Amino acid sequence: MEATRQLRSFASRVFRYAVATARAERDPAQLLLGALTTPRVKHFAAITDPVEFGALLRVIEDYQGDPSVMYALKLAPHVFQRPGELRQMEWAEVDFEKAVWIIPEGKMKMRQPHSVPLSRQALAILTEMRQLSGSGRYVFPSVRTRARSISDNTINAALRRMGYSKEQMTAHGFRTSASSLLNESGKWNPDAIERSLAHMVAGSVRRIYNRSAYWKERVEMAQWWSDYLDELREGGNR
């Protein structure tokens, strides 16, 4: 949005000069003044306290619902991708040998393919789920039909059943939790964290570079993060 405002301002200066030199009759960019509003950022409820997050992980560990929901809940904290990307995860996107989940650009918010390093814990969760849904397309198929993935509200509904209100935790909140706790650890480059979250990086050249940058650090960070989640689940950071 800031880039759009700057472009309008530049265009307005060009047209004002054109009017002053009799090359134009008016400044059409003036019509956009005040029309370019910044969209309201939607914040999703998330748990960012380590002890409280550990308690959530223990509740997830004890969850006894549908297997697709149960394993999606277990995997979500480890990979911290957007809920839509997680629920539509396909077996064809998972490379067990290279320990990576490659999300195609068509599923990504930024329309760029995104590689997610998989920790030993994440691979173990997927290995267990493969015994249940490996013959189908989706990692987390719907309980009604294996031809579709679980719905977009399934994870949120499970969180409500576990006693977490929408003001406390959401499916999208796993991303906020990871971002907050990883940054607070002070162990990782903030750019590597942002890349793991697949956040937009300004500038086309930087975006191309950023796609492959920090991969080694991201792999190490993914394993550290999963180990840290295990520690929290077992009662660490009390």
Regions found by a protein language model. Give the residues of each.
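Catalytic-site neighborhood detector that most strongly recognizes the C-terminal catalytic loop/helix
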Residues: 47, 102-111, 123, 187, ...
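Residue-level detection of the helix-turn-helix DNA-binding "recognition helix"
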Residues: 9, 16, 91, 184, ...
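Short, basic (Lys/Arg/His-rich) helix/loop patches that form interaction surfaces
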Residues: 58-70, 79, 116, 124, ...
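Residues in the recognition helix of alpha-helical DNA-binding motifs
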Residues: 7, 14, 89, 158, ...
